[in-house]
Curated annotation (Swiss-Prot):
GO terms for cellular component: membrane raft; plasma membrane. It comes from Dictyoglomus turgidum (strain DSM 6724 / Z-1310). It is found in: Cell membrane; Membrane raft. Keywords: Cell membrane, Membrane, Transmembrane, Transmembrane helix. Homooligomerizes. Pfam families: FloA. This is Flotillin-like protein FloA. Its main location: membrane. HAMAP family: FloA. It comes from the Bacteria. Belongs to the flotillin-like FloA family. Found in functional membrane microdomains (FMM) that may be equivalent to eukaryotic membrane rafts. FMMs are highly dynamic and increase in number as cells age. Flotillins are thought to be important factors in membrane fluidity.
Length: 329
């Protein structure tokens, strides 16, 4: 009977130890004590209950302790992890900042990490500036010649402006705008080709890093190429447009002239019809004059001779015009 009770107690002890060691990573606790980090067993159990991986927190705390970061505590690391932050990266960034002599607190590093920035990369960029290449920027000088420029922008991360500061895209856009402004204000494209550093000096003096997460160290023009003669092309396009406008105006005047000609022809036909209608009244008037004795028979024949003579002259005149037109043809 005692043997059975002893066996049951052994089983219960083994179950208790299994549950205990599942909650308490004993090896991690020993490692922390060996590194001089004071950790209570209850802290490890609490992390398990809060579903916080003790390995991530304890190892980061050991690194911070060995680096002399006294401000980093267990509660801060656990709170940052529960907020969705990257504890290991924050501690590595603090160590790198301390070695480089960059003032960076845990709260600032945690805020940068929670803002979605890579805090470790930001610290490294503060020590080793990063080079950003802009795409080819095309601009036109005052003489109408297009220039295509490409720049290299050396930037250093500004730790104080990482939260809420604009990113690389803003730097590239502002540098491109500065290049366009500088080339556009040049009297001749030759001025830019002779002094390409004038672009970088002008752009750098504009303070383009205001409101961004970076500090511009230098702007270097990598390449400047001559593009199209935009001014000449615009003049050609303008001349072609003017020619089309003139052609349209000429066509409009021609249409008006044709319409006027047709109108005059219609008016001529109308006048001719009135003339014929009036000529129909002449014989009646002559007959009435003969009947009333206003003219005599001799006067009548004299009038007929005049009419015949006029008709003959008109016929001869028309014949002469036809012969002259035939010679011209």
């Amino acid at each position: 009977m005692n043997l059975i009770w002893g066996f049951l107690i052994l089983i219960l002890v083994l179950i208790f130890l299994g549950v205990f060691f599942s909650f308490v990573p004993l090896g991690l606790w020993i490692s922390a004590l060996a590194a001089g980090v004071s950790i209570r067993i209850t802290d490890l159990i609490g992390m398990r209950l809060r579903r916080v991986p003790p390995g991530v927190i304890i190892n980061s705390l050991i690194k911070a302790h060995k680096a002399g970061l006294s401000e980093v505590t267990l509660d801060k690391l656990e709170a940052h992890y529960l907020a969705g932050g990257n504890v290991d990266k924050v501690v590595n960034a603090l160590i790198a900042a301390q070695r480089a002599g960059i003032p960076l607190t845990f709260e600032k590093a945690a805020a940068i990490d929670l803002a979605g920035r890579d805090v470790l990369e930001a610290v490294q960029m503060s020590v080793n500036p990063k080079v950003i290449e802009t795409p080819v920027v095309a601009a036109v000088a005052k003489d109408g010649i297009e220039l295509k420029a490409k720049a290299r922008v050396t930037v250093r991360a500004n730790i104080e402006r990482l939260v809420g500061g604009a990113g690389e895209a803003t730097i590239i856009a502002r540098v491109g705008e500065g290049i366009v402004t500088t080339i556009g204000s040049a009297e001749s494209y030759k001025e830019v080709l002779e002094n390409p550093d004038s672009i970088s000096k002008t752009v750098l003096a504009k303070g383009l890093d205001a409101g961004t997460a970076f500090e511009i160290v230098s702007i270097d023009i990598a390449d400047v190429d001559v593009g199209n003669n935009v001014g000449a092309r615009l003049k050609m396009d303008q001349a072609e447009a003017d020619m089309r406008i003139a052609q349209a105006q000429a066509e409009s005047r021609r249409a008006l002239a044709i319409a006027r000609e047709q109108e005059m022809k219609a008016l001529t036909q109308e006048m001719r019809a009135r003339l014929i209608e009036a000529e129909k009244e002449v014989p009646l008037a002559i007959a009435e004059a003969l009947r009333s004795g206003k003219i005599g028979v001799l006067d009548y024949y004299t009038l007929k001779n005049i009419i015949a003579d006029t008709a003959m002259r008109e016929a001869i005149s028309k014949l002469g015009q036809k012969e002259e037109e035939g010679r011209k043809d």
